């Protein structure tokens, strides 16, 4: 079908600029997102001491956020598809900045649980809107690379958070530190509102596909492909949530590392993973977009082996080296897991589709902190980290049944062979 005469056209340079500015801005927001999220793990020993919390209770502070964050994924994706990305990005950022600030005035376990749950509402509206914004402002051929760059900033935020938060806690205390990061969220929100480009025309970003095929939310919800990737993301995301939550406490309590050195040692794996997630997005787009299993399964098995070596390390340095290698290899696999739905879902329903996939990842966010806290209380840190080895191997097994190519990714009730 020929394009209408009034169909807008853009030069390649304009298309590239739209994608670059969009990804750059969203990377900044994701960094703040993860700093605000990870700082709770760094502050946990001090919050636990102030309020006399057990390890299980500390784990519930992370899980309260993660549970609400999970519940907001599908509604957040639906709202983004219905009302557009820009407005929802701003509402999300404003809400989570407010509740980050309110964390600093909490007076006990109950108030912390409520505030962190409401913080989860704010952050839970963000992922679907961010994927929607990327899909509207990129062409399908570069979408996994763009999404990989955006998601690499998760690990950048997770990496820099201990470097920023640990000194601030020492100088200002944990309460004032939450106020400082809340102010940073407001600042990046102003930049996002002023600088986010308009969406590309539908014939460039592919948002006319759903209209042509009559597909919508119902087809996404019934898609076995979407739910299989949600299960895969659940298994593999246990690693990130588990290590981010409990490694700082492990280094402080079991290895006797100072807070500043704990911050540095906790940052290194996240920064390496930031680079490998970005590289993984490029590798997937360039070489593996039609052979996802061949890419993901070996990487997950290598990750599991490195986690075993991490668990056996005799020194804190050895532990950090193997943790860094494990998270680096896991980072390479990330866009093999998320890149397929990012490439295959039409922009008009990508918010809903990625919301469902992200539900799987956030189930891991609910389970990992509290299960590992329970294992530490009842057994040891070794038992807790052993759980992550098992879930990583489980991810490799689930990868055997997910679609390998975009044309196998069905929005109907059956997958193509």
Task: List where the protein language model places each region.
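C-terminal transmembrane helical hairpin of 12-TM major facilitator-type secondary transporters
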Residues: 290-337
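Conserved MFS/SLC helix-loop-helix module at the cytosolic interface between two early adjacent transmembrane helices
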Residues: 71-107
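Cytoplasmic helix-loop-helix junction between adjacent transmembrane helices
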Residues: 115-154
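Extracytoplasmic gate region of multi-pass secondary transporters
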Residues: 40-41, 224-278, 334, 338
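Juxtamembrane intracellular "pre-TM" segments in multi-pass secondary transporters
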Residues: 7-15, 199-229
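Helix-loop-helix hairpin linking two adjacent transmembrane segments in secondary transporters
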Residues: 150-197
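Cytoplasmic membrane-interface "Motif A"-like loop-to-helix N-cap segments
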Residues: 82-93, 285-300
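Helix-to-loop junctions at the C-terminal end of transmembrane segments
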Residues: 73-84, 277-289, 376
């Amino acid at each position: 079908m020929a394009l209408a005469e009034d169909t807008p056209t853009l030069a390649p340079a304009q298309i590239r600029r739209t994608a670059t500015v969009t990804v750059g801005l969203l990377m900044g927001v994701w960094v703040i997102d993860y700093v605000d999220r990870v700082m709770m793990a760094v502050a946990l020993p001090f919050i636990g001491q102030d309020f006399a919390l057990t390890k299980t209770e500390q784990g519930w502070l992370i899980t309260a956020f993660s549970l609400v964050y999970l519940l907001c994924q599908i509604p957040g994706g639906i709202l983004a598809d219905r009302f557009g990305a820009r407005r929802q990005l701003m509402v999300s950022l404003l809400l989570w900045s407010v509740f980050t600030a309110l964390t600093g005035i909490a007076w006990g376990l109950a108030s912390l649980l409520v505030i962190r749950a409401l913080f989860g509402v704010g952050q839970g509206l963000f992922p679907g809107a961010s994927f929607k914004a990327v899909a509207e402002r990129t062409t399908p051929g570069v979408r996994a690379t763009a999404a990989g760059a955006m998601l690499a900033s998760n690990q950048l935020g997770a990496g820099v958070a201990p470097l920023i938060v640990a000194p601030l806690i020492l100088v200002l205390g944990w309460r004032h530190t939450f106020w400082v990061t809340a102010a940073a969220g407001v600042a990046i929100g102003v930049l996002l509102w002023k600088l986010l480009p308009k969406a590309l025309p539908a014939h460039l970003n592919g948002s006319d596909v759903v209209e042509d095929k009559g597909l919508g939310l119902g087809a996404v919800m019934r898609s076995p492909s979407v739910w299989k990737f949600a299960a895969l993301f659940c298994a593999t995301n246990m690693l990130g949530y588990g290590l981010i939550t409990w490694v700082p406490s492990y280094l402080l309590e079991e290895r006797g590392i100072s807070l500043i050195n704990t911050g540095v040692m906790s940052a290194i794996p996240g920064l390496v993973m930031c680079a490998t997630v970005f590289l993984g997005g490029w590798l997937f787009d360039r070489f593996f977009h039609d052979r996802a299993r061949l890419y993901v399964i070996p990487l997950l098995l290598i990750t599991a082996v490195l986690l075993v070596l991490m668990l056996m390390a005799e020194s804190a340095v050895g532990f950090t080296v193997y943790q860094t290698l494990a998270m680096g290899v896991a980072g390479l696999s990330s866009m093999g897991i998320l890149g397929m739905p990012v490439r295959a879902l039409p922009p008009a329903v990508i918010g809903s589709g990625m919301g469902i996939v992200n539900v799987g990842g956030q189930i891991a966010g609910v389970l990992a902190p509290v299960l590992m806290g329970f294992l530490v209380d009842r057994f040891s840190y070794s038992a807790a980290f052993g759980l992550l080895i098992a879930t990583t191997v489980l991810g490799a097994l689930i990868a055997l049944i997910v679609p390998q190519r975009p044309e196998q990714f069905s929005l109907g009730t059956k997958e193509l062979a």
